[in-house]
Amino acid sequence: NATGWRDGSRAVRGLLKAEGIWVKGAHIIDGSGLSYRNRLTARTLTETLTLIATDPELRSIRNALPTAGQSGTMRNRFLQSPASCARGQVVAKTGSLPPTVSTLAGFTTSPNAPSRAFAVLVNDRPAAQAWSATSAAIDAVAAAAHGCSR
């Protein structure tokens, strides 16, 4: 019901704001993220991920994310160079709204460096560009955040 979604949206925005997370420009229409009218910035996502990584009560969310090249929706990602150097070192949530939106948000992990939160959002992907090319480009950006270089 629309009233329930509105109340839920206000509650989520209020919680984010109370934690000091940037919510300017955030539009949460439904709780699933499947509405084309939902809007979040990379900053909002990255700050939320940072909270997840630092709050012991939320850490289980991070631990549930699939690993690049190994599990879940990330099983077939980060397999080709230049992103392959981050295989097994990135945990993230994929997202897409066909035909033009593709996203990846999560963490880089390394035994030798602190974890880094990242969010890559692609809107208005050219219709002629294949999903695989978009995914490869997003993976390369996340790999660069991990510290991989070309």
Spans of model-derived segments:
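Active-site-proximal alpha-helical segments within enzyme catalytic domains
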Residues: Y36-I61, T103-L104, T109-N123, A137
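Short, gly/Ser/Thr-rich active-site loops of penicillin-recognizing serine hydrolases
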Residues: A2, V12, A136-R150
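Active-site-proximal beta-strand/loop segments in catalytic clefts of secreted hydrolases
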Residues: I29-G31, A64-G69, T94-G95, T108, ...
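Short, Gly/Ser/Thr-enriched beta-strand-loop segments that form substrate-interacting elements
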Residues: L79-N112
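Short, charged, low-complexity patches
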Residues: A127-I138
